C-alpha cells in the first residue's frame, strides 16, 4: 500500500485549523482519521459482469445479510452482527473475538438459562467473500478448492476455526441453496 500524500514537507499543518468550522475554537484531543477511496463502484469486464469497488469484501456480506433479515419471516427471531476488524484478526473490542455479541445476548435474554437455550436453538453463519481463481494464475489455488468467478457461493472451512462453518452449518447452507436453485 502507498502512504497517501496530503502536503509538501515544508508546509505546516494543524488539525485544529483544518477543522475550525467544526470545533469552533475548541481543542481537538484525539482523532480517528482515515483515508477512504470514495469512488463509486463500477461494473467492469467485457460483459460488465464484475464489480470493482473499495471495501467490497465486508460491505457486500453485511448488506446482503441485512437485506435477508429485512425480507425474512418475522415470526422467527433473527440477529445480525457485523463485526469490525475482520481483516486484522478480529481481536479488537469490536471484532468477532471481542465480547460485543456475548454482551448483547446477555442484555436481550431474561437470564443465563434462557440465553443458553436460545444459543442451543440457533444457527450461526459467518459470511465473507472468497478470492476467485484468476484464469492467468490457477496454480495460486489448490486444484480442488478454487472458487470459480460468478459460479455461486463458496463454503469456507478452516482447521483453526477462523470461520463458524461446521458440518451442520455447511449442510444447512447447501440445503438452502439447493431449494433456491443455486448451484
Pin down the residues of each PLM region:
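N-terminal hydrophobic/helix-forming segments and targeting peptides
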Residues: 1-183
Amino acid at each position: 500500500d502507498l502512504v497517501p500524500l496530503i502536503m509538501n514537507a515544508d508546509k505546516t499543518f494543524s488539525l485544529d485549523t483544518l477543522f475550525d468550522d467544526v470545533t469552533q475554537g475548541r481543542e481537538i484531543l484525539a482523532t480517528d482519521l482515515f483515508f477512504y477511496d470514495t469512488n463509486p463502484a463500477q461494473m467492469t469486464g467485457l460483459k460488465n459482469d464484475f464489480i470493482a469497488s473499495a471495501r467490497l469484501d465486508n460491505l457486500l456480506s453485511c448488506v446482503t445479510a441485512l437485506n435477508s433479515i429485512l425480507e425474512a419471516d418475522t415470526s422467527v427471531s433473527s440477529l445480525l452482527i457485523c463485526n469490525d476488524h475482520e481483516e486484522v484478526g478480529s481481536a479488537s473490542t469490536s471484532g468477532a473475538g471481542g465480547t460485543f455479541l456475548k454482551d448483547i445476548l446477555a442484555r436481550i435474554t431474561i437470564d443465563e438459562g434462557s440465553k443458553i437455550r436460545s444459543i442451543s436453538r440457533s444457527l450461526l453463519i459467518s459470511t465473507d467473500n472468497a478470492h476467485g481463481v484468476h484464469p492467468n494464475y490457477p496454480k495460486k489455488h489448490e486444484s480442488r478448492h478454487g472458487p470459480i468467478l460468478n459460479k455461486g457461493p463458496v463454503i469456507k472451512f478452516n482447521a483453526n476455526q477462523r470461520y463458524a462453518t461446521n458440518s451442520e452449518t455447511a449442510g444447512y447452507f447447501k440445503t438452502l441453496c439447493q431449494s433456491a436453485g443455486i448451484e
